[in-house]
């Protein structure tokens, strides 16, 4: 499903890695692993931060990376997939489900974090080509579980972890 808002302009922090890369539980899962960051933006701060704990991060972003780069990333296989601050900038549940299912094709463990905005639960357009859901992390649980039948989906504070059932 095509996204109505590309969220290209939401990749704005070139100096600080997304919070998921410093969350204790997420760091423990990623340490020493290969990681694909789905919708990771135009900057490499995530890869740089994760190198400290031995994780090798490849970033896929259809709006901020070249088609050649993205094809090479998707050709790989990974231990962990990260979706950080992505679901909250997509205005369609179907498109959010597509992102989650893409991540699930690349790794058996997903780490998902969202920016909660004002926490009102009322999504709104924030710029010409940008959207913010303003939903709390817990509010994404049902739709993530629906997108991942046969997976265990659990929330740990502001982190959602999904793992394939074995």
Please identify what each model-predicted range represents:
Residues 1-74, 109-166:
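Class I (Rossmann-like) S-adenosyl-L-methionine-dependent methyltransferase catalytic domain
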Residues 66, 89-90:
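Catalytic P-loop NTPase motifs of RecA-like helicase/translocase cores
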Residues 82-85:
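A conserved beta-strand element that flanks and buttresses the S-adenosyl-L-methionine
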Residues 87, 99, 116:
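Flexible, active-site-proximal loop/turn residues at the rims of small-molecule/cofactor binding pockets
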Residues 90-102:
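A short, conserved alpha-helix within the catalytic core of class I
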């Amino acid at each position: 499903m095509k996204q109505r808002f590309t969220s290209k302009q939401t990749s704005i922090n070139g100096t600080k890695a997304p919070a998921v890369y410093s969350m204790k539980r997420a760091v423990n899962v990623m340490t020493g692993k290969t990681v694909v960051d789905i919708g990771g933006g135009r900057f490499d701060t995530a890869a740089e931060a994760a190198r400290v704990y031995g994780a090798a991060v490849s970033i896929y972003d259809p709006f901020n990376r070249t088609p050649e780069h993205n094809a090479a990333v998707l050709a790989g296989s990974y231990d962990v997939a990260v979706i950080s601050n992505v679901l909250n900038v997509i205005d369609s549940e179907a498109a959010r489900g597509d992102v989650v299912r893409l991540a699930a094709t690349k790794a058996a463990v997903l780490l998902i974090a969202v920016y909660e905005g004002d926490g009102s639960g009322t999504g709104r357009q924030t710029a010409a080509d940008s959207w913010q859901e303003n939903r709390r992390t817990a509010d994404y649980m049902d739709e993530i579980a629906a997108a991942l039948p046969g997976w265990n989906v659990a929330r740990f504070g502001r982190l959602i972890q999904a793992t394939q059932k074995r």
